[in-house]
């Protein structure tokens, strides 16, 4: 995956090129495309045409940050920057950039409004680059997918073990808190070779309705018989290049789930299934969604 894939995608979609813009680290896509880390203090534009070699437009001050300067246009002031852009983009009508119309996808909306004005002022039609980036840099390799699936299997087993342990304690009338269950689950995940950026969430009853809830040793509800319990856990294999898995499950600490609880669970489950079916149908049809 890389620039050749990006150019192939651009040609297939009839887009003239991809303009990656960054100002002092505002767009992480640039570092991914160029590779490595650089200390850049001025505006940088990396033009990837559908056909031909890419061109870098950067300040002369930052010239030393780039080892390969063969395709570089250095500018010294704003007017020369605009001139360089105008020259580099000559002949292009449709330009993909990191922006999302209406702010619909903020993760890939990295270009400020003024820069969009600048490119449009050069007579270009700006279109979103999200699909370009995903196709060229965000598809999983077979090895990466294997790490994701292995992590998912470990998480699934850890989840089952935690529910069984917690409900056994609760039904027997023995005291166990959200935090204690969380710590047991986190240790099991680590013992199975997973790494994570935050400990899993174990939330009972109304706490399960707070998306940002996390139990602490000081503030943690006791899990009792007939309680509703949510477990949200994520992790990846503790090795380079591994990919996260993330699951959320709910359970009921009783012999029979109340009708209202089941009704809510069924609604969420059916919504999940409908979303997956929509994505599968779109993928089979080669349709973006």
Model-derived regions: residue spans:
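Active-site neighborhoods and metal-handling regions in enzymes and metal-associated proteins
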Residues: 1-289
């Amino acid at each position: 995956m890389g620039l050749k894939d990006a150019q192939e995608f651009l040609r297939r979609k009839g887009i003239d090129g991809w303009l990656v813009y960054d100002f002092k680290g505002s767009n992480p896509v640039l570092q991914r495309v160029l590779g490595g880390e650089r200390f850049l203090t001025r505006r940088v534009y990396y033009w990837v045409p559908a056909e031909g070699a890419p061109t870098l437009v950067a300040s002369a001050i930052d010239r030393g940050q780039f080892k390969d300067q063969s395709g570089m246009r250095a500018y010294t002031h704003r007017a020369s920057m605009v001139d360089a852009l105008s020259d580099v983009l000559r002949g292009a009508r449709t330009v993909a950039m990191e922006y999302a119309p209406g702010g619909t996808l903020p993760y890939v909306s990295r270009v400020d409004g003024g820069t969009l004005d600048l490119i449009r002022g050069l007579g270009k039609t700006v279109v979103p680059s999200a699909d370009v980036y995903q196709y060229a840099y965000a598809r999983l390799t077979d090895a990466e997918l294997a790490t994701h699936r292995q992590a998912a299997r470990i998480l699934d087993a850890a989840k089952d073990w935690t529910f069984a342990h917690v409900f056994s304690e609760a039904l027997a009338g023995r005291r166990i808190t959200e935090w204690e269950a969380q710590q047991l689950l986190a240790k099991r995940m680590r013992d199975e070779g997973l790494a994570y950026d935050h400990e899993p969430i174990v939330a009972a009853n109304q706490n399960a309705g707070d998306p940002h809830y996390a139990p602490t040793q000081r503030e943690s509800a006791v899990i009792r018989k007939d309680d509703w319990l949510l477990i949200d856990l994520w992790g990846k294999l503790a090795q380079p290049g591994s990919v996260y898995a993330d699951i959320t499950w709910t359970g009921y600490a009783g012999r029979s789930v109340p009708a209202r609880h089941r009704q809510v669970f069924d609604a969420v489950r059916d919504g999940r299934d409908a979303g997956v079916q929509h994505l599968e149908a779109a993928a089979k049809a080669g349709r973006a969604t």
